[in-house]
Amino acid sequence: MANGKTSFGYLLPTREVVMAPGVPDFGSMIDLAETAEGYGFDSVWCGDSVLARPRLEALSTLAAIAGRTKRVKLGTAVFLPALRNPVILANEVANLDIISQGRVILGVGIASKTPAVQKEFEACGVNFRYRVSIFEEIITIMRRLWTENEVSFYGRHFQLDGVTLGLKPVQKDGIPIWMAASAEKPQRRMLQIGDGWFPNAKSPEAFTEGWNQIEALAKESGTDSGRLHKALYTTLNINEDKAQAEKEMREFIEGYYNMPFETMARTQSVFTGNVAEAQAWLKGFIDAGTETMVIRFSSPDQAGQLELCSQEVLPAVDS
């Protein structure tokens, strides 16, 4: 994988380990991250939610993994900045970049409009109605704190007067920020304040359609779409037994999101099938221009899926 044109990431099951009975097995997350690095994966990722979909906290989990890995990038897929204070968050992410020696990628989103997420924002003291403008101000503030010596900012939600963040990231231009932008308004926002496009495209055709729209918006606004890194978040279950793969996918999606599988499958990138079919599925996205694929496995056998994917699927699609 390190020799190919495409980068591959593994999303750690930080929600599943919390959903399981008993005390969450954090050690298994470390083991899986080390295994992924050993298999040649280029990055490991953690999701984010405080209340709506409980899981291990992303940044502290990645900090622990940073101490046990040497090469893999460490990313969030995806993080919800609007739930945090921008100065504290900028400091925490810069600290993670220092711990990992410059390996952090921040995949971010504005949060889905569901009752559980709205309740989560309310409990965290954030007005859900203003989450987009809060998000925009936080991204702008963090970028400036990471790269400027003294920052003054007077926005609708946050005001800073001559603030200096003494803890700067190792990455001199700041932390790369990828955005899950699938519609026109988020895509326009991404062109202004993002570094990468990180959709959950349901097919290679949808990925191509989305990117074509971004290029058109960039041309219209006079911005450079070529600077954006093109990534994908996708969920796989690789199994020669198609029926078993579909059963595990349905159980995973419905348990994870507390929503019907059919509802989520209409908009999310999900695949079930054997090795050859998985190769064809991923190759389609590579041909569509995907530069990084972040893979989530919808299986209770995470180690088995990780091995099967790395040994039999990925070498064939990225040669």
Question: Can you say where each PLM-predicted feature lies in the sequence?
Answer:
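Alpha-helix-loop-beta-strand connector modules within alpha/beta enzyme cores
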Residues: 56-76, 134-141, 309-319
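N-terminal beta1-alpha1-beta2 module of alpha/beta enzyme domains
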Residues: 1-68, 173-175, 296
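N-terminal small/glycine-rich loop or linker at the start of catalytic domains
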Residues: 1-21, 113-119, 156-175, 242-269
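Active-site mouth loops of central-metabolism enzymes
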Residues: 12-27, 79-86, 171-182, 236-237, ...
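Hydrophobic faces of well-ordered beta-strands that scaffold small-molecule active sites
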Residues: 8-12, 44-46, 74-76, 104-108, ...
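Conserved, mostly hydrophobic/aromatic
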Residues: 36, 40, 48, 65, ...
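Flexible, glycine-rich active-site loops centered on histidine and acidic residues
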Residues: 2-22, 82-152, 205-212
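Short, acidic/polar
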Residues: 23-36, 89-92, 179-189, 274-284
